[in-house]
Amino acid sequence: MTKFDYIIVGGGSAGCVLANRLTEDKATNVCLIETGPKDKNPLIHIPAMYAFLRGANLIYEYDTVPQKNFSDVTLAEGPAKISDTFGRTYSIPQSYEEKRKGYQPRGKVLGGSSSVNGMLYVRGHKWDYDHWAELGNEGWSFKEVLPYFKKSENNEVFSDDLHGQGGPLNVAAQRHDNPFTRFFVEAGSKVHKLNNDFNGDDQEGVGIYQVTQKNGLRCSSAVAYLNPIKDRENLTIFTDTTVEKIEFEKLRAKSVKCISTVSYTHLRAHETSL
């Protein structure tokens, strides 16, 4: 049985950060286990190619489960009035399905979903964090989590009290100026206010997203947090390795049994499995 101080199950968005932070202590031995492969596929790193990742065996293709007790029929609403650019108005019917499902892909590769998502950088709404704190979750108010957002990012677009510089995660403006994007934002501004920064003091409105990219390439959690430290002597990374069983001692996860394409391994943590 191979022993480590910490075993991290899942080399996704959070797992890569944990591996980075825990191995800052040279006396701490860490093992990171990811069921997917290394993030070598060029489709991951070229931003425009994320639309083609669906067939690359790097994604868990989940669907949401329809809510119970909803009708199976398609419900019709009243007609909607649509105006074109020439001022002509059309009336079209609207309908929706109560039993509809939503496609929810998740990454199966180093970096997890941060390696396969659309790279949009949008923080949660302040109200949500403050509400969590009001419910009794100490340390989760927006004021308390903001320093960690700032610590994580290197924002190329904004430099103020709400944004950070020098962090591992690069946040940039979109490099491609698509005129149709500007047309869409202009149209949206007719019914809602413009907002140049969804992560600023006001988080609502219509505008252009910031993206997690650096020098025109995806800046995933693996790129930002894992690649710079992957050669640390106190870090072991297993890819293409699936954890089959987590073993507990009382309420603490202490060891895992995992299988790869070439071996079956039993790993134990002195501290805990995360």
Name each model-derived stretch.
Residues 1-268:
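N-terminal redox-cofactor-binding region of secreted/periplasmic oxidoreductases
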Residues 269-274:
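A short, hydrophobic C-terminal helix/tail in secreted or cell-surface proteins
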